[in-house]
């Protein structure tokens, strides 16, 4: 049995965590098993599922709890656990690439950096320190890692430009189980009934962690503008996070409590997307979000900020809009874009584009076993 160590912050239901779990579910676990090395406390949404699939989950203290303790924990871990065929480090920046250093020290042959973002959150504490560290660590990339992956051209440029390895970096698609998202009228009716959504209601959908970069606060402004001409418009928000209370307060201040649905963290995103009429993502920046791939698989038209990678438009159903435009402009575009797009079946198109999880698994397995 070969084992691969997946390295990330935690196993909450976010984009990169969902990507890793999609791969884990689809990979032949009789041949390759995953373990997880995390820096966040136990209790992530995916932890029990990962354990049930055969994973060991290990925890080390995060770097912000003490630099020396962090490095000692990494050294101790890899001195005892160095029989992996590969480590797969999922990162949003190069601020913390030390696991790969210790993996190399203890002889793990395949060491992967995987870029899932295209910038650093400006709301992040000590943002400027993270940015400086990101660029200071670029000269180390070629010696720490053996493979350089990313979810989009923007994510690849952000992580590997000026490192000397950009030409070697590979795009790995955020593959999903496409059939699971295929439009189903029966499920749509069930979900709408569950949340008290009328047949004639117009539902704007969004899936994402409640953090500043996702910009859910702007979605509330958009809904407020839509209500000027369409009182039946509703906002379906899937996820939770640090800014959730702020969003709920804004919803209350605008008197939109009956028009905004907070589902919390859900494991049935494919099902919830059936109830939506359009998917909107006004993020300040992204790599290539898994949720945008999921929305296209569900046949939803998408309006997204132009800070998101244009690589994400796999079906010709995404309208990119400037994040600097007003909520009024966004609301008009949402209505116009919905009118121009029906509810197409995009499954085969996504598969041809290489966004089926089986295709992604094949690519990663070849990297894990050293064929690439």
Regions found by a protein language model. Give the residues of each.
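A conserved mid-protein helix/loop that constitutes part of the nucleotide-sugar donor-binding site
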Residues: 17-22, 202, 206-225, 242-248
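Active-site donor-binding acidic/aromatic loop of nucleotide-activated sugar
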Residues: 243-246, 257-266, 272
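Aromatic "clamp/platform" in nucleotide-sugar-dependent glycosyltransferases that forms part
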Residues: 92, 265, 284
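A short, active-site helix/loop in glycosyltransferases that binds the activated sugar's phosphate group
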Residues: 141-182
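N-terminal strand-loop element at the rim of the active site
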Residues: 6-72, 242-244, 367
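Short hydrophobic beta-strand element within catalytic cores of glycosyltransferases
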Residues: 37-38, 301-305
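A short helix/loop element that forms part of the nucleotide-sugar donor recognition site in Leloir-type
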Residues: 74, 182-197
């Amino acid at each position: 049995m070969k084992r691969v160590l997946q390295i990330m912050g935690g196993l909450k239901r976010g984009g990169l965590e969902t990507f890793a779990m999609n791969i884990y579910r689809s990979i032949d676990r009789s041949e390759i098993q995953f373990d997880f090395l995390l820096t966040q406390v136990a209790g992530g949404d995916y932890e029990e599922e990962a354990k049930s699939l055969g994973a060991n989950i290990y925890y080390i203290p995060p770097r912000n709890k003490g630099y020396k303790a962090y490095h000692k924990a990494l050294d101790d871990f890899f001195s005892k656990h160095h029989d992996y065929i590969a480590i797969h480090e999922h990162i949003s920046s190069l601020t913390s690439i030390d696991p790969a250093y210790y993996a190399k020290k203890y002889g793990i042959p395949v060491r992967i950096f995987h870029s899932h973002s295209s910038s650093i959150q400006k709301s992040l504490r000590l943002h400027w320190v993270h940015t400086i560290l990101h660029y200071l660590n670029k000269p180390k990339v070629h010696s720490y890692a053996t493979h350089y992956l990313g979810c989009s051209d923007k994510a690849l440029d952000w992580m590997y430009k000026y490192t000397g390895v950009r030409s070697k970096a590979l795009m790995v698609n955020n593959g999903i189980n496409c059939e699971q998202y295929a439009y189903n009228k029966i499920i749509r009716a069930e979900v709408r009934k569950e949340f008290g959504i009328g047949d004639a209601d117009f539902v704007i959908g969004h899936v994402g962690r409640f953090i500043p970069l996702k910009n859910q606060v702007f979605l509330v402004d958009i809904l407020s503008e839509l209500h000027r001409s369409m009182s039946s418009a509703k906002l379906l928000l899937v996820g939770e996070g640090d800014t959730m209370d702020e969003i709920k307060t804004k919803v209350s201040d605008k008197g939109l409590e009956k028009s905004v649905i907070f589902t919390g963290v859900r494991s049935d995103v494919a099902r919830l997307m059936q109830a939506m009429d359009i998917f909107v993502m006004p993020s300040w920046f992204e790599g290539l979000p898994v949720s945008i791939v999921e929305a296209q698989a569900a046949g939803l038209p998408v309006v997204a900020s132009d800070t998101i990678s244009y690589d994400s438009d796999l079906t010709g159903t995404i309208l990119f809009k400037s994040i600097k435009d007003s909520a009024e402009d966004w609301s008009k575009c949402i209505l116009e874009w919905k009118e121009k797009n029906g509810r197409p079946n995009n499954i085969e198109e996504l598969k041809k584009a290489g966004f089926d999880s089986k295709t992604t698994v094949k690519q990663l397995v070849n990297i894990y076993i050293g064929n690439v």
